[in-house]
Design a protein with these regions (language model features):
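Extracytoplasmic/periplasmic ligand-binding sensor regions of membrane-associated signaling proteins
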Residues: 83-91, 97-181, 185-188, 233-235
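Extracellular/periplasmic juxtamembrane segments that couple receptor/chemosensory ectodomains to their
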Residues: 195, 206-276
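Conserved small/polar residues in nucleotide/adenosyl-binding loops
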Residues: 295-298
Length: 298
């Protein structure tokens, strides 16, 4: 009986030790992912803030008669100078009420194009939105680069739409941020619009950019709080991951760091197997010695 109790005690101690190792591995992953997503949040928020300030500067200039009275070269410099300092930014365009390009940050004589069909123009044309608008990721019509469009409208003295200022942030900028981080085998990094549209992802796949994941369990968790962690199975590749997420400042964007559960527990699986095997050997030895001792007494 004593040998049985001793072997059970050994088994209990090892089981507790194995479970403690699992908790430590999990808690360490949560802390690491939370720190990573906080760093991404700050970086993306800084980019968005600087870019929005540039757009607001163009809006203010377009409604300032003194700026609009300047010679063309000076006017372009006054309107677009700040945008040149924002990392990852493409061109900034000013569209008239019909969606035609009337001013262009990259060309003194604006390129001919119409964007009346784009969501970032139509939301202001219909009066459905005010303030900053973040569009769905698109391949820019003029540059051909995958970009995230961001726009603001300006109005005449009667409150009617006078035009839209739209600029783009190259998706390669976000990909560059993601590729600097190591989330292990099976890990993923995602930037979403608040409505569930995928803006950028690591590992990179152009096919999924712009896809809406609204209504999926993962998206419902992301939208339920400003920040946090949860475990879930990804809608895109069905991999079970630990997610750490944050909403980006006051912008309609969410970023997450997702580490695969298998990657988090890989080291623990090995330790658990070794410790468990050793515990079984000790338990068997205790029972075996007890049996031998009993036989010698008999």
């Amino acid at each position: 009986m004593l040998a049985l109790l001793l072997s059970l005690g050994i088994g209990g101690l090892f089981a507790r030790s194995i479970w403690t190792l699992r908790e430590e591995a999990w808690n360490n992953a949560e802390r690491t992912n939370t720190n990573l997503v906080r760093a991404l949040d700050r970086s993306i928020a800084r980019t968005m803030e600087a870019f929005d300030q540039s757009l607001q500067g163009v809006v203010e200039g377009m409604t300032d008669p003194r700026v609009m009275a300047l010679p063309l070269a000076m006017r372009n410099l006054a309107l677009f100078d700040n945008s040149l300092r924002v990392q990852g930014v493409g061109s900034i365009l000013v569209l008239d009420p019909a969606g035609n390009v009337v001013m262009d940050s990259e060309h003194a004589v604006p390129r001919k194009a119409n964007f009346a069909d784009r969501d970032y123009f139509k939301v202001f044309e219909s009066g459905a939105h005010t303030g900053l608008y973040v569009g769905a990721p698109v391949r820019a019509r003029l540059s051909g680069l995958l970009s995230l469009p961001v726009s603001r409208a300006f109005y005449d003295s009667q409150g009617r739409l006078a035009g839209v200022v739209v600029g783009t942030i190259r998706l390669a900028h976000f990909q560059g941020l993601f590729e600097e981080l190591n989330v292990g085998a099976g890990g993923a990094l995602n930037l979403f619009r608040a409505d569930g549209v995928l803006v950028a992802r690591y590992p990179y796949s152009e096919d999924v950019l712009g896809r809406s994941l609204a209504g999926t369990p993962t998206m419902r968790n992301l939208q339920a709080a400003r920040s946090g962690t949860f475990t879930g199975r990804a809608a895109l590749d069905k991999v079970e991951r630990l997610y750490a997420f944050r909403h980006v400042g006051d912008y309609p964007l969410m970023v997450n760091v997702a580490q695969s559960v298998d990657s988090i527990l890989a080291g623990w699986y090995r330790s658990a197997w070794l410790s468990g095997s050793f515990a079984l050997v000790l338990m068997a030895a205790c029972v075996g010695l007890a049996v031998l001792d009993r036989k010698s007494v008999v």
